[in-house]
């Protein structure tokens, strides 16, 4: 929600844009997917600390050294690439693969649905 992101970053702090949304909207059965080239952005660290404290599930996509995100995500998908463009392309491909997996999983179960 771009309006919510603008409001939080302008009125509170850009460092809190993801954490405040996770606090309000995440449930125990949710999985938060985090994407960061360095893995060290303060807003990524803040939401990851919150999720780990609340035992919420996280998947981190990172590049370069992976940083905090690679070390503290429940599942870390790290591409040791030192180029932003290539790293972002790899993350896009991995996200497409993940979304295809989720979409196919939705077709084969009567359990809770994953909403895309």
Can you name each region flagged by the protein language model?
Residues 1-113:
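Glycine-rich phosphate-binding loops that contact phosphosugars or nucleotide phosphates
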Residues 116:
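Catalytic core of pol beta-like nucleotidyltransferases
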């Amino acid at each position: 929600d771009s309006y919510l992101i603008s409001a939080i970053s302008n009125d509170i702090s850009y460092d809190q844009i993801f954490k405040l949304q996770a606090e309000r909207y995440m449930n125990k059965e949710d999985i938060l997917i985090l994407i960061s080239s360095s893995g060290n952005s303060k807003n990524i660290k803040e939401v990851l600390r919150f999720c780990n404290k609340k035992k919420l599930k996280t998947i981190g996509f990172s590049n370069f050294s992976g940083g905090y995100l690679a070390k503290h995500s429940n599942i870390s998908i790290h591409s040791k690439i030192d180029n932003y463009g290539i790293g972002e392309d790899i993350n896009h491909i991995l996200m497409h693969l993940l979304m295809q997996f989720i979409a196919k999983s939705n077709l084969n179960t009567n359990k809770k649905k994953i909403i895309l």
